[in-house]
């Protein structure tokens, strides 16, 4: 599914109240200053897409090739460039320098949000995979946080790939699907998305229309 999306910054979490008094936990996303830097077409690039810049970056931190690319579009450098595959009809409605705002979405719409999860560093199997710990007492000595056996015998004589073991936890790309847009603050260019999304405060996220809306609650 080819749809235009937005690049945003995770501001944090709060809650809002419905007219009936129900409390809804929401994540606030700043989606200001999404500006088009390039329109790709089948004729020039072999496919149709739009490239969007988000945030700001000092000119001294921009490479010369990128500076030339942005100057051609007539936009200032951003922290991040993101490409969205779209159809030709939608691409024809956009132009270099155009600003894509929060009004791209509507209240109640289902969206997919992609971000980088918070890094936890090196973690054991209890924290990483919710393994059970060893017994605290009753003869157990220095085996409280061990994963247990990781293999079998001389046959097969190896540890199978994918075996859940200790290692780095977090700091991976995570996509949460079918989140609902609870409120849109067009004046402050904010999206309030129901529920939690990956990443720490200040992290960059990508918001796109949901691709698996059938049967979504």
Swiss-Prot record:
PANTHER family listed in its UniProt record: 50S RIBOSOMAL PROTEIN L3, LARGE RIBOSOMAL SUBUNIT PROTEIN UL3C
Post-translational modification: Methylated by PrmB.
Cysteines paired by S-S bonds: none
Keyword Ribonucleoprotein assigned: yes
Modified residues annotated as N5-methylglutamine in this record: 154
Known partners and oligomeric status: Part of the 50S ribosomal subunit. Forms a cluster with proteins L14 and L19.
Gene Ontology terms: cellular component: cytosolic large ribosomal subunit
InterPro entries xrefs: Ribosomal_uL3, Ribosomal_uL3_bac/org-type, Ribosomal_uL3_CS, Transl_B-barrel_sf
Keywords from the named record: Methylation, Ribonucleoprotein, Ribosomal protein, RNA-binding, rRNA-binding
Function according to Swiss-Prot or TrEMBL: One of the primary rRNA binding proteins, it binds directly near the 3'-end of the 23S rRNA, where it nucleates assembly of the 50S subunit.
Family under the similarity heading: Belongs to the universal ribosomal protein uL3 family.
The name this protein goes by in its record: Large ribosomal subunit protein uL3
GO annotation, biological process: translation
Family matches, as Pfam families: Ribosomal_L3
PROSITE patterns (alphabetical): RIBOSOMAL_L3
Originating organism: Burkholderia vietnamiensis (strain G4 / LMG 22486)
GO molecular function, one term: rRNA binding
Gene that encodes it: rplC
